Amino acid sequence: MDAYEYGELLKTLSKKMENISNIVKPDELKKRLDEIEEMQQDPNFWNDTANAGKISQEKTRTERILETYHNANDAVYDAIEYFEMAKAEKDEETLEMLYEDAETLKERTNALEVQMMLSGEHDSNNAIVSIHPGAGGTESQDWASMLYRMYLRWAERHGFKVEVLDYQPGEEAGIKDVSFIIKGENAYGYLKVENGIHRLVRISPFDSNAKRHTSFTSVMVSPEIDDDIDIEIEDKDLRIDTYRASGAGGQHVNKTESAIRITHEPTGIVVQCQNDRSQHKNKSAAMKMLKSRLYEYEMAKKQAEIDGVEKSDIGWGHQIRSYVMQPYQQVKDTRSGQAFTNVDAILDGDIDKLLEGVLISQAK
């Protein structure tokens, strides 16, 4: 990097910070923080624990955005000041230090952009994730299990908890279906960009001729919705089927029709749960999944109306990412256009840069 390139980078980052400042409105956020702190001084504040909890979460999010904003803003304007001084004094050592720090400077502004993209109404919620293999039998089912492991490892890296709602193993390998909740701050905000079709290209370990296969698996992500959010679900719109749970679980599981499948006929959304031996608990978990999926569906429909997208384009039916393992190694996201060669690390849950790249591209 030379002085011209670094100067252009500073112009870009300075303009970006100006735009972000207009959106973030740091003075208004600081004012809101002061209001919350004043509210928390009131002895009656904690009488309504649910409301107090929400306001405390808002405070934490606001503090995080402000801290990230000030860190990025200070770093950019300090760099501009040092750059001008070093140029004037022909201080080559300081200039080299600034050039070396350019990547860190970009990462700070990127972190701020990501924080902004995680400020949606339900971005801080837990995420309900469902993975369904496409046609292709064992190969697709194995691909579904690879994606399942990827998300579990991602959750583990972040210290998030995972609760399995429904797990149906494949006959030979992999999984036929899995639904689970990832519990942690901004789990939905990050994983909402995973909605869609994931494509795998590799030499199949299940093909004795060692031919290359292409497999598809759909991933659906919706926010875990609080009980106080009203989602209207009419009984007449539901078809509820019970069946025997598959897979391990002992004799009791196989004798009792404890597994539940609920179909919401107006939208065609299907959810199922067989995680518990209690049919009542499985039905409760399935209804929670349905509520979240319907909420996500309605939000997507509203956004589509704003964007002028055809109704047929709404949903989870679009290919969003390709994972190529042979003849070369590459993961490419169709929305951000970013390509990565560290396929093994990504499949081991190292997906933050992937997710953040999509979040930032959607902000533009």
Swiss-Prot record:
Localization in the cell: Cytoplasm
Highest taxon, organism lineage: Bacteria
Keywords: Cytoplasm, Methylation, Protein biosynthesis
SMART domains with a match to the protein in the record: PCRF
InterPro entries found in the cross-reference section: PCRF (IPR005139), Pep_chain_release_fac_I (IPR000352), Pep_chain_release_fac_I_sf (IPR045853), PrfB (IPR004374)
Pfam family, one: RF-1
Keyword Metal-binding: no
Regions crossing the membrane: none
Signal peptide (from-to): none
Residues that bear N5-methylglutamine: Q251
PTM field: Methylated by PrmC. Methylation increases the termination efficiency of RF2.
A GO term from the CC aspect: cytoplasm
Record carries keyword RNA-binding: no
GO molecular function: translation release factor activity, codon specific
Listed PANTHER family: CLASS I PEPTIDE CHAIN RELEASE FACTOR (PTHR43116:SF3), PEPTIDE CHAIN RELEASE FACTOR 2 (PTHR43116)
Family to which this protein belongs: Belongs to the prokaryotic/mitochondrial release factor family.
Function (record text): Peptide chain release factor 2 directs the termination of translation in response to the peptide chain termination codons UGA and UAA.
Name of the protein: Peptide chain release factor 2
